[in-house]
Amino acid sequence: MRLCDRDIEAWLDEGRLSINPRPPVERINGATVDVRLGNKFRTFRGHTAAFIDLSGPKDEVSAALDRVMSDEIVLDEGEAFYLHPGELALAVTLESVTLPADLVGWLDGRSSLARLGLMVHVTAHRIDPGWSGCIVLEFYNSGKLPLALRPGMLIGALSFEPLSGPAARPYNRREDAKYRNQQGAVASRIDKD
């Protein structure tokens, strides 16, 4: 069962759930909390690689990722990031989220943006128990026109679901947690699997 707005506010008040900066009550709706777009992005560079062998040797996968992923792009206030049709880009939420070991979160895109062709997450919309950090957004423009994305705009909504008990291996205690405490648009770390 997902938390309702009253429960989300109570969990925030009690410090069991942390969203920083804390959203105003106007952004806590029914069963979700609206989140905004941060100012950090990462894209694929123009490249000539025919493919990335994801099951290849880790050092080769790492080198291929380094060749195709851009450095982090940080926008100044008022600047826009343009996502063209057929392009994939990474970004982050403005908010940093910390979940306890007995709560899982879910990210959903906004219907109004989806109707323009913007996918906010390609597959990864679960936020693990014990997670702490900004949420990485996997943008894809499936529409026909470039989309101007500006830091601070409403980009998605989080919902939260209590678990039957605390997870034995929450994200923040796992040795193999590749994205622990991420604050920026961290590129794929599949080479760390």
From Swiss-Prot:
Signal peptide: none
Residues holding dCTP: R110, S111, S112, L113, A114, R115, D128, V136, L137, E138, Y171, K178, Q182
One GO process term, biological-process aspect: nucleobase-containing small molecule interconversion
Reactions listed under catalytic activity: dCTP + H2O + H(+) = dUTP + NH4(+)
Keywords for this protein: Hydrolase, Nucleotide metabolism, Nucleotide-binding
One GO MF term: nucleotide binding
Enzyme Commission identifier(s): 3.5.4.13
Record-linked Pfam families: DCD (PF22769)
Positions of the UniProt region annotated as Disordered: 169-193
Broadest EC class assigned to this enzyme: hydrolase
Residues of the active site: E138 (proton donor/acceptor)
InterPro entries, per database record: dCTP_deaminase, dUTPase-like_sf, dUTPase_trimeric
Keyword GTP-binding: no
Pathway where this protein functions: Pyrimidine metabolism; dUMP biosynthesis; dUMP from dCTP (dUTP route): step 1/2
Record HAMAP family: dCTP_deaminase
Subunit description: Homotrimer.
Family according to the record: Belongs to the dCTP deaminase family.
Function text: Catalyzes the deamination of dCTP to dUTP.
Protein name (Swiss-Prot/TrEMBL): dCTP deaminase
Organism: Escherichia coli O139:H28 (strain E24377A / ETEC)
